[in-house]
Curated annotation (Swiss-Prot):
EC annotation from Swiss-Prot or TrEMBL: 3.5.4.6
Quaternary structure and partners: Homotetramer.
Keyword Transmembrane found: no
Enzyme class, first EC level, given as a word: hydrolase
Gene encoding the protein: Ampd3
Cross-referenced PROSITE patterns: A_DEAMINASE
GO MF annotation list: AMP deaminase activity; metal ion binding
Residue ranges that the Swiss-Prot or TrEMBL entry lists as coiled coil: none
Reactions the enzyme catalyzes: AMP + H2O + H(+) = IMP + NH4(+)
Name by which UniProt lists this protein: AMP deaminase 3
Organism for this UniProt entry: Mus musculus (Mouse)
Region (Disordered): 89-114
Domain of life of the organism encoding this protein: Eukaryota
Gene3D superfamilies, A to Z: 4.10.800.20, Metal-dependent hydrolases
Length: 766
């Protein structure tokens, strides 16, 4: 059966939910006092009066519930369900004996569904012995039964919405979470959660071979409402009958987004999530206290493997700043010494040599220092993104940026390619470090893609230690004001139409087809703190009608990027080609609503600092195990002091975090920027070896490395969740840690499944 996008109407949206969602947007748009806006999403921890009032309300609810006969029955039912769940979550060594036949998602705690057996199956892995922390009788986390039911069902619905969007775009969704959300024991196909990345060429293969492009299909592509539709032929185009692919529906997306917006402001849900997150952090502290030495003993007995020789991926780095400042300075001096009379630019028909470029700037490269180069971010860039962007201009000269850090210039981006290749060689020499640099496509012209592919092939930039991500800066307003684009739809068309053409007719676009093998995802980048006066809704103008010079809001960009990536991925999957992940910058600054948009559309995000401000979203990101690439050193110079960065807190709670460098040229001092990031985090937060190796393992899982590479670096079963998916001989992550993470996630998910099961039992008794 063909995959289709399930549609909803605005009439399906509850009036209360719609009003709450509009209230959130209205508050954010008006830019009211930030504390007032944040109070919508947070729990009043720092306000004694607010805390007291909240406790009073909870106490009144508890007293009212005690007098209710109906509530007493439900409490009894919950206690029974909870005791069953706990009995499944406390495996004994005897329970776990047997051949490794059980499904990974059914261990150690099988979701309770009607008709399911209460006896757990045999262990699919050798269960590690360690001291577990269990709380009995904890059936609703210290809140009323009514609030617990409401919160759990709402969270489950939000996760189902996330799962729908993830599966349609071939993004990842954790199989364990899916199993708990499934009805009547539905199985979740294992391959569903695996994106298709092109495996690296074999040593004897040419990575630039253009002869393996599949045959052309001759399909036609047209844009409707900002989304590209595929048609088998001219007749189908005239009939408006598109090729059988899932095409997104804006009204459905707005309904789903409204549900999440209403959920993150719901009082009982905020309280429930806040308490569960506090519990997760405290539980990890207890786990560390009880099992730290056992974990360390596991690692010490693991031969040949330590933190230095486990694979690490820099999951968020911009290609234009992938070298450190000393590297850039050395390269500038080297080019000036070896080829000063080379023609490097042309201005008004006059050819300009490298010596003349520096003469016009009144400087001698010999006298340059890292200080005079002035590309490093410092105290003056804090909360000043405009000043930070200027740091991309060496010595403040845009001429040097165009010459050394661009792919399109008189030299065809040769200098930039040479520097990137030097960085790649350093990664290859280190053997265990990988990188995912971002290259820019702006959407000014459809020729940008062919130019970038030509740069990649002509300068032979491929490296086995690099995978490429395309970043799309959110700067439509600049292009529109300069009359470079007629509307936002044209920008989307320039970004995505060449990709559809290369997918449909690869024989006609061989260079781009080859380049796309090494591209694994898309990013959306710019200053998130920029304010937008527009509220994205079903009444927003479609991209072809967005002709104003005002920049569309963040959520508008994300929806239309996701929509086109989703259609493209389904078309490429149909052709047996690699697919792409959507990995936007999100939650670094700006509005909490950015994180709502990313929850629906993104496979993973970069930064995620604002999750700290919303317990509901933070808990949802935990339950859905959405990967977050965090860059504490970058944040320290731009938005958040290092000591206040939530990375350590997120790691302890069990969120899927990795460390990344963002911009080594601006933020780092050493040749190995990623190791510098790990070293500082380890020192400041006193992270253990197991913590560091867990973060490194997360980075490989989050990355666009192929299935074959991940099997080689993490183990044959890396895609299975829990200890069964961990090979300590390759990852150096203790099985005790993996078992703790998995059992804790299962416990949290069981709260949601218990609430759904209770509803089914209540319906049956009635």
């Amino acid at each position: 059966m063909p995959r289709q996008f399930p549609k909803l109407n605005m009439s399906d949206l509850d009036e209360h939910v719609r009003l709450l969602a509009e209230k959130v947007f209205a508050k954010v748009l008006r830019e009211e006092d930030s504390k007032d806006v944040m109070s919508l999403f947070t729990v009043p921890e720092d306000c004694p009066i607010g805390q007291k009032e909240a406790k009073e309300r909870e106490l009144q609810k508890e007293l009212a519930e005690q007098k209710s006969v109906e509530t007493a029955k439900r409490k009894k039912s919950f206690k029974m369900i909870r005791s069953q769940s706990l009995s499944l979550q406390m495996p004994t060594q005897q329970d776990w004996k047997g051949p490794p036949t059980a499904s990974p998602a059914m261990s150690p705690a099988t979701p309770l569904v009607p008709g399911a057996t209460s006896k757990p199956g045999p262990a699919p892995y050798a269960m590690p012995e360690y001291q577990r922390v269990t709380i009995s009788g904890d059936y609703c986390a210290g809140i009323t039964v009514e609030d617990y039911e409401q919160a759990a069902k709402s969270l489950a619905k939000a996760l189902m919405i996330r799962e729908k969007y993830a599966r349609l775009a071939y993004h990842r969704f954790p199989r364990t979470t899916a199993q708990y959300l499934a009805h009547q024991g539905e199985s979740v196909p294992l391959e569903e959660g695996l994106p298709d990345f092109h495996p690296p060429p074999l040593p004897q293969e040419d990575p630039y071979c253009l002869d393996d492009a599949p045959p052309n299909l001759g399909y036609l592509v047209r844009m409707h409402g900002g989304v590209l539709f595929v048609y088998d032929n001219q007749t189908m185009l005239e009939r408006q009958e598109p090729h059988s692919l899932p095409y997104p529906d804006l009204e459905t997306y707005i309904v789903d987004m409204s549900h999440i917006l209403a959920l993150i402001t719901d009082g009982p849900t905020k309280t429930y999530c806040h308490r569960r997150l506090n519990f997760l952090e405290s539980k990890f502290s207890l786990h560390e206290m009880l099992n730290e030495m056992s974990e360390f003993k596991e690692l010490k007995s693991n031969p040949h493997r330590d933190f230095y020789n486990v694979r690490k991926v820099d999951t968020h780095i911009h290609a234009a700043a992938c070298m450190n400042q000393k590297h850039l300075l050395r390269f500038i001096k080297h080019t000036y010494q070896t080829e000063p009379d080379r023609t490097v630019a042309e201005k008004l028909g006059r050819k300009i040599t490298l010596r003349q470029v520096f003469d016009s700037l009144h400087m001698d490269p010999y006298d340059l220092t890292v200080d005079s180069l002035d590309v490093h971010a410092g105290r003056q860039t804090f909360h000043r993104f405009d000043k930070f962007n200027s740091k991309y201009n060496p010595v403040g000269a845009s001429e040097l940026r165009d010459l050394y850090l661009k792919t399109e210039n008189y030299l065809g981006g040769e200098y930039f390619a040479r520097m990137v290749k030097e960085v790649a060689r350093e990664l290859e020499d280190s053997k265990y470090q990988y990188s995912e640099p971002r290259l820019s496509i702006y959407g000014r012209s459809p020729k940008e893609w062919s130019s970038l592919a030509r740069w990649f092939i002509q300068h032979k930039v491929y490296s086995p230690n690099m995978r490429w991500i395309i970043q799309v800066p959110r700067i439509y307003d600049i292009f529109r004001s300069k009359k470079l684009l007629p509307n936002f739809g044209k920008m989307l068309e320039n970004i995505f139409l060449p990709l559809f053409k290369a997918t449909i007719n690869p024989q006609d676009h061989r260079e781009l087809h080859l380049f796309l093998k090494y591209v694994t995802g898309f990013d959306s980048v710019d200053d998130e703190s920029k304010h937008s006066d527009h509220m994205f809704s079903d009444k927003s103008p479609s991209p072809d009608l967005w002709t104003s010079e005002q920049n569309p809001p963040y959520s508008y960009y994300l929806y239309y990027m996701y929509a086109n990536i989703m259609v493209l991925n389904n078309l490429r999957r149909e052709r047996g080609l690699s697919t792409f992940l959507f990995r936007p910058h999100c939650g670094e600054a700006g509005s909490i609503t950015h994180l709502v948009s990313a929850f629906l559309t993104a496979d993973n995000i970069s930064h995620g600092l604002l999750l700290k401000k919303s317990p509901v979203l933070q808990y949802l990101y935990y339950l859905a195990q959405i990967p977050i690439a965090m860059s504490p050193l970058s944040n320290n110079s731009l938005f958040l002091e290092y000591s206040k960065n939530p990375l350590r807190e997120f790691l302890h709670k069990g969120l899927h975090v990795s460390l990344s460098t963002d911009d080594p040229m601006q933020f780092h001092y050493t040749k190995e920027a990623l190791m510098e990031e790990y070293a500082i985090a380890a020192q400041v937060w006193k992270l253990s070896t197991c913590d560091l190796c867990e973060i490194a393992r997360n980075s490989v899982l989050q990355s666009g490395l192929s299935h074959q590479e991940k099997q080689k670096f993490l183990g044959q079963n890396y895609y299975k969740e829990g200890p069964e998916g961990n090979d300590i001989r390759k990852t150096n992550v203790a099985q005790i840690r993996m078992a703790f993470r998995y059992e804790t996630l299962c416990n949290e998910l069981s709260f949601l499944s218990d609430a759904m099961k209770s509803e089914e039992i209540t319906a049956l008794t009635k």
